[in-house]
Design a protein with these regions (language model features):
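Phosphate/nucleotide-binding catalytic core
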Residues: 1-510
């Protein structure tokens, strides 16, 4: 609204998607049907998810199609918006959950039966029954509303301690309304209490298909140490519920927003006497992380798995008996320590030899920095890995740059003798450092110091991407990518176009 200088979230996802899907199926005559982009519903009614209609190849020409494809999808979305609507590629809407002025169009009061939120109305949740059911079931399984506390950025005018005056401390509509006053809302923090604060965030995800399971496992493992680094390099979400935060990333916000663990599982209530700590087959157990968090184990190198892994022992044993290797069996058994969050009655009794729905029900609600994706039943899709940590950027050029950089890194991993492996515990440390304010300049990250040794050192992000000065054993990610490009046959124009994307990544980490 230019006249009143306000910006709100449009809740017209359903209408816009209907128009887009009709357009993509009937109006794009110049694009083959199997190559037309697709648009999908997401958690928030103010969100659109888009994917290319067809996977890209690995040639230089295919890489240079990434940005035009993103531009096409944005153009299509804009075509079906109203005159006062704009498709914004931002991680989190800065005023989501504020009380002083409406933040959605149309405006709604927060009193929803699914979330019980003090700040967010259920009307911003996708209408499909899956999404409000997810919201309610996380709250019910947990035994309370989710508890999100983001450190507040402090300046000379910030009161000490800061007690948020915008929290409706005296609301008495739902039983959980008193949680904020009873300790759920921390002082000097931005308090949020609903799944929508996390699943209302947007990100940039890239999926790779490998020629075989062994290559997929190698790519998965080599990408794991890079997930915190790319999170820091793409950091783009410093504002929550109208307050400037002391973090720059969404990750811990989403992690807390879907944390369905009970008090006992979170370690906030005692285990029963004699109860094993990591036994998913018992009713009470400890779970170290939310189901939205960083990867917990490698698939190819046990020595880097230095953190105890909670597993569903029956699943692990069944997989081992069926010939699945030990590390992959442990990975899958770890996914199955979680309960399903939504099951539709018509899908309870399925033939698992023909349907993967039961597996995907668990797999798709384990939201980690990487996802290892077995081939679906039927068709020609192979083993895939999904890189999930990056934050969405404002422009198509920026998003294309990080996608292309990641694709080129995947080629480095598969064609050059590199090894980024390091203890998973240090990857977890890096994930927390990556989210701190101005992590590019203020933090140092654990990273392997040489491909000839398993030792790690702490480096700045610039050191890791450009190479450590005076250390020829740690060449840096960007020099490795350029070395790979040097081996390819391409025109000078193509190389210059690729270099523009890599230059953006290089400048971002400086």
């Amino acid at each position: 609204d230019h006249e009143h200088k306000t910006a709100r979230l449009s809740l017209r996802q359903g209408e816009i998607l209907e128009c887009l899907n009709r357009c993509c199926s009937t109006e794009l005559d110049d694009i083959r049907p199997d190559e037309r982009p697709t648009f999908h519903p997401e958690y928030g009614r103010f969100m659109l998810e888009s994917t290319p209609g067809k996977p890209f190849g690995v040639s230089v020409a295919e890489l240079l199609r990434v940005e035009p494809d993103m531009e096409l999808r944005r153009k299509l979305a804009r075509k079906h918006l109203q005159a006062n609507e704009v498709p914004m590629a931002i991680v989190s809407y800065p005023r989501l959950g504020t009380h002083d002025t409406p933040f959605t169009d149309p405006a709604h009061v927060p009193h929803g039966e699914a979330s019980h939120s003090l700040f967010l109305p259920d009307e911003l949740i996708n209408k499909h029954v899956r999404f409000p059911t997810l919201t309610a079931n996380i709250r019910k399984r947990r035994g309370s509303k989710v508890r999100i506390n983001v450190p507040l950025f402090r300046d000379v005018h910030t009161p000490t301690p800061f007690v948020d005056p915008s929290v409706p401390w005296d609301r008495h509509e739902f039983a959980e309304d008193q949680e904020a006053a009873l300790g759920a809302a921390y002082t000097d923090h931005i308090y949020m209490d609903a799944m929508g604060f996390g699943m209302g965030c947007c990100c940039l995800q890239v999926t790779f298909q490998a020629p075989c399971i062994d290559d997929a496992k190698r790519m998965y493992d080599q990408f794991i140490p890079l997930t915190p680094l790319l999170l820091a390099a793409t950091a783009a979400s410093p504002v929550y519920r109208g307050y400037l935060a002391d973090v720059d990333c969404r990750w811990n916000v989403i992690s807390a927003a879907v944390d369905d663990r009970t008090l006992i599982e979170r370690g906030e209530a005692p285990l029963k006497e004699g109860e094993p700590q990591h036994n998913s087959d018992s009713a009470e157990r400890r779970l170290r992380k939310s189901r939205y968090d960083s990867v917990d184990s490698y698939l190819t190198t046990r020595e880097w798995n230095d953190v105890p892994l909670e597993m569903n022992e029956r699943v692990r044993q069944r997989l081992l008996e069926s010939g699945v290797d030990a590390l992959l069996a442990e990975h899958m058994a770890h996914l199955f320590v979680r309960d399903p969050l939504v099951i539709f009655s018509e899908n309870i009794n399925l033939d698992d030899t023909r349907s993967m729905d039961h597996f995907e029900n668990i797999q798709s609600t384990n939201w980690q920095t990487m996802r290892f994706k077995p081939p679906p039943h039927g068709g020609h899709t192979g083993w895939r890995v999904e890189f999930r940590s990056m934050e969405i950027q404002l422009t198509d050029f920026e998003n294309a740059a990080f996608c292309i950089f990641l694709v080129l890194l995947s080629r480095v991993i598969m064609t050059m003798p590199v090894d980024f492996g390091m203890p998973i515990s240090l990857v977890d440390v890096n994930m927390q450092r990556a989210q701190r304010r101005d992590a590019i300049h203020s933090q140092r990250f654990h990273f392997r110091s040489s491909r000839h040794t398993s030792q790690t050192q702490e480096y700045t992000l610039a050191d890791i991407f450009h190479g450590s000065p005076g250390d020829n054993t740690m060449p840096g990610l960007l020099p490795l990518v350029h070395s790979y490009l040097d081996s390819l046959n391409m025109s000078e124009t193509e190389r210059q176009r690729l270099n523009r994307y890599l230059d953006l990544v290089a400048m971002r980490v400086d």
